[in-house]
Amino acid sequence: MTVEMNKSIVKAYSVLETGEPLPFDVAVELAHLAGEDVPDLLSLANKVKNRYATLSEGALHSCSIINAKSGVCAENCRFCAQSLHNSADVEQYSLLDAEAIVRSAGDVYDEGIRHFGVVTSGYGYRKVNPEFLKIVAIIDQLRQEYPDLNVCASLGILGEEPVRMLAEHNVRHYNINIQVAPDRYSDLIADSHPLKDRIDTIRLLRKYGIPVCCGGILGVGETMRERLDFIYALQELDIAVIPLNVLVPIEGTPLQGAATPALTDIVKTFALCRLVHPGKIIKFAAGRETVMNDFQGLLMLAGANGFLTGGYLTTRGRKIGDDREFMRQLAGFAEVSCS
């Protein structure tokens, strides 16, 4: 018996053959897939990942972060527990001292993690100020203590001088997310600052040669078509690493009662992101352990080739040791190492 594959998936095999991004019109067709066609899409995305997004020595990308400054943020991001506009119960503290941050980095380093991000709450740093200089000094100390550790940062919106300093101090990746389709940012995410501030920061980072880590969040009220608009917006910005989060609703935020997207829509979004970005790092971040639960491995077979491990900003994650076993199990589906 001959089984015919969905015609839209057949069209999408051009990505596997050429390494060229999926055309938008085909992505729209694939977004409507349902039932037994969905696993065929995931299989294609996994093949594209294995062919075009193999990392050094075949390893999966894994990173960990520290919430180095928590809460008291004047921005009104609707999903975020750290916003002063929301009433979530979250720990608040100013910038941690260098000892605490270096100690945290050492803990994950000992677990084999080689990408570590320093994250702070707040709008960001338009200009260099004393707090920013402390962060730069901490970055230097991290690099001195652990020479092969890739030190990353997520410090909000930046002006040109702060970006220049981060480049001089060899920040490996800088994370700043656009979150959703550009024309939905103000109503789905925040209107206390324009998305343009984030895009301007991304352009400055690229100007100074800092690879950009930029992604978004699923489940904040967007449609499947708007997820495609988001994915293609990332293509225009030439992003190096794409973190995809699935909303974990937090009590005390405007999205505390938000419905979780259908599992099939989540996995289709990951797969389509891979087909649009054949050679990029696509990592699964928040929602991996909680929203996806038993199905988190499915996303690693739907085009993702990295993940955030060890916890998030205000929610807990899995133990790094558990994730290393997770990586070993995934190695059976592709020629990847667990280092």
Swiss-Prot record:
* Pathway where this protein functions: Cofactor biosynthesis; biotin biosynthesis; biotin from 7,8-diaminononanoate: step 2/2
List, for all copies, the residue spans of the domain called Radical SAM core.
Answer: 55-288
Going by the entry's taxonomy, the superkingdom of the source organism is recorded as Bacteria
Return the EC number: 2.8.1.6
Kindly state which reaction or reactions the protein catalyses: (4R,5S)-dethiobiotin + (sulfur carrier)-SH + 2 reduced [2Fe-2S]-[ferredoxin] + 2 S-adenosyl-L-methionine = (sulfur carrier)-H + biotin + 2 5'-deoxyadenosine + 2 L-methionine + 2 oxidized [2Fe-2S]-[ferredoxin]
Q: What residues does [2Fe-2S] cluster bind to?
A: C152, C213, K283
Q: Which GO terms describe its biological process?
A: biotin biosynthetic process
Matches recorded under InterPro entries: Aldolase_TIM (IPR013785), BATS_dom (IPR010722), Biotin_synth/BioAB (IPR002684), Biotin_synthase (IPR024177), Elp3/MiaA/NifB-like_rSAM (IPR006638), rSAM (IPR007197)
CDD domains named in the record: Radical_SAM
Binding locations of [4Fe-4S] cluster: C73, C77, C80
Q: Which UniProt keywords apply?
A: 2Fe-2S, 4Fe-4S, Biotin biosynthesis, Iron, Iron-sulfur, Metal-binding, S-adenosyl-L-methionine, Transferase
Question: Which Gene3D superfamilies does the entry link to?
Answer: Aldolase class I
SMART domains given in the database record: BATS, Elp3
Q: Which cofactor does it need?
A: [4Fe-4S] cluster; [2Fe-2S] cluster
Q: How is the cofactor bound?
A: Binds 1 [4Fe-4S] cluster. The cluster is coordinated with 3 cysteines and an exchangeable S-adenosyl-L-methionine.
**Protein family (similarity comment):** Belongs to the radical SAM superfamily. Biotin synthase family.
Record function comment: Catalyzes the conversion of dethiobiotin (DTB) to biotin by the insertion of a sulfur atom into dethiobiotin via a radical-based mechanism.
- The protein's name: Biotin synthase
Instruction: State the organism named in the record.
Output: Chlorobium phaeobacteroides (strain BS1)
Encoding gene (name): bioB
